[in-house]
């Protein structure tokens, strides 16, 4: 199993959104505050579901919510520094080093599981139920800026969509997905928090030394910090899977909502979400798509504009091509052992080059 990072957006959250839309539970032009009460009265309350899906909400790309849980009095100097020094030895990115030692606030995290701290972040690290609520409160507040509605890819959009799914379905999103999709489709290797079902050795490690969680190898816990501090289940990241299971989802989309003789989504809903496109970016409704400018997008140059899918930071991608009846899934752990050594997959253009071979094979 692999941490599929932002491909959670289309392999999990978007499926739930499409299902609820199929059932007439919301409209694309509805304000998100209609379904997420914490946003009522907030400037963000007028953001529409369509804005979130197109990444045109005005919200920033991400936010370091985990800093709210860190006791600032527990370390000397700044948390990050641009160069190594006596208190900052662990490199986490190019010209970025993290403080050697710090503590979490006791009101938010504990080293032992309990009724008060039930959400596991890592080995011997648990967060309470209040912190995910605090994340939503911070999104609603003026602390997180709201800018113009141009295209700006944001994980926060899908954090809010997950909250909407849970408010409408009256179920935790991971349970809703298991009930409506993963269980019936035989996707036994697709789930959040995989250590609840699988042995550690069955899960590919993500990074060698995680600076937020005990400075140990991260295996079986989501890499994304937002998802981690929400207990592993978020709309932007958190899902673990393998290529075979992911291919089932995208084959279902290629086949207009059907898989294995069972209908999961209506043809009309599949066509709407897979064909509708933003007027100001290449984005579809929740999906990424090819760019009309050759060499600029995430897909092979020969991929038709009908293709939909998504990539993930940990080194994954999945693309459904309904025009040619093709599904392409690529999974890797490119940020292992160190997250700042991940550029090769992109600079070598490996994923689009493999996809290009598929289209060349069609011609041959």
Residue ranges with predicted function:
Residues 310-364:
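Structured C-terminal helix/loop/strand segments within mature extracytoplasmic catalytic/sensor domains
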Residues 17, 249-250, 358:
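Hydrophobic "lid"/C-terminal helical patch
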Residues 1-54, 144-157, 234-237:
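Short active-site loop at a secondary-structure junction
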Residues 1, 273, 303-308, 315:
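Short, P/G- and charge-enriched loop/turn segments at secondary-structure junctions
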Residues 1-4, 25-27, 136-140, 144, ...:
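Short, conserved catalytic-motif segment at the N-terminal edge
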Residues 1, 28, 121-136, 318-321, ...:
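A short, well-structured edge-of-sheet supersecondary motif
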Residues 44-305:
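Short, surface-exposed loop or secondary-structure junction motifs
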């Amino acid at each position: 199993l692999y941490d599929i990072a932002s491909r959670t957006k289309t392999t999990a959250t978007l499926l739930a959104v499409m299902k609820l839309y199929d059932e007439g539970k919301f409209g694309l032009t509805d304000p998100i505050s209609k379904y997420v009460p914490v946003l009522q009265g907030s400037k963000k309350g007028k953001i529409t579901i369509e804005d979130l899906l197109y990444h045109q909400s005005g919200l920033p790309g991400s936010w370091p919510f985990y800093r709210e849980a860190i006791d600032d009095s527990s370390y000397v100097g700044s948390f990050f520094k641009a160069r190594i020094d006596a208190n900052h030895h662990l490199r986490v990115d190019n010209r970025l080093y993290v403080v050697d030692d710090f503590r979490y606030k006791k009101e938010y995290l504990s080293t032992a599981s309990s009724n008060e701290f039930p959400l596991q972040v890592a080995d011997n690290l648990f967060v309470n139920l209040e912190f995910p609520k605090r994340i939503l409160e911070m999104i609603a507040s003026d602390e997180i800026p709201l800018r113009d509605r141009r295209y700006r890819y944001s994980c926060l959009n899908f954090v809010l969509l997950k909250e909407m799914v849970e408010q409408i379905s009256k179920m935790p999103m991971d349970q809703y997905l298991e009930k409506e999709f993963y269980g019936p489709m035989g996707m036994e290797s697709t789930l959040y928090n995989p250590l609840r079902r699988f042995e550690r050795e069955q899960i590919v490690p993500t990074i060698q030394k995680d600076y937020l969680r005990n400075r140990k190898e991260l295996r079986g816990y989501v890499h994304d910090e937002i998802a981690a501090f929400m207990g592993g289940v978020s709309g932007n990241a958190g899902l673990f899977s393998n290529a075979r299971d992911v291919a089932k989802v995208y084959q279902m989309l290629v086949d207009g909502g059907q898989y294995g003789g069972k209908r999961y989504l209506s043809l009309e809903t599949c066509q709407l979400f897979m064909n509708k496109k933003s007027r100001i970016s290449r984005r579809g409704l929740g999906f990424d798509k090819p760019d009309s400018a050759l060499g600029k997008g995430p897909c092979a140059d020969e991929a038709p504009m009908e293709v939909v899918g998504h990539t993930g930071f940990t080194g994954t991608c999945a693309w459904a091509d309904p025009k040619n009846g093709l599904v392409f899934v690529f999974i890797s752990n490119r940020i292992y052992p160190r997250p700042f050594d991940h550029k090769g997959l992109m600079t070598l253009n490996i994923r689009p080059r493999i996809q290009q071979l598929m289209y060349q094979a069609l011609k041959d």
